[in-house]
Amino acid sequence: MLKENFIAVLQATSKAAEVSCNEMLSDSKRLEVVDARSVAIKILAEAGYCPCRIARFFHKTEASVRHTLNNFELRLESNKILEKILQNTRKILANK
């Protein structure tokens, strides 16, 4: 069940951000990929997944996941595209 939820969020975010799932799971620093990965991490955290589980799924450190979560609202204020990706991902997930 856990893996299916991660995959559903990953696929929904991939579709909303127009970034491949493989790119989101990579170490890419491209802004589009970072935005998509950040949205997926935020949604998973809101769903109750702990940073250590999210980190394992994305092959990141727990510290990098916490950093993403701690800075998400600040990035959201200055990045309207990030807000749109978040909204669209939530819509896609709500329709599943």
Mark where each language-model region is.
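Basic, alpha-helical nucleic-acid-binding regions used in initiation and control of genome expression
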Residues: M1-K96
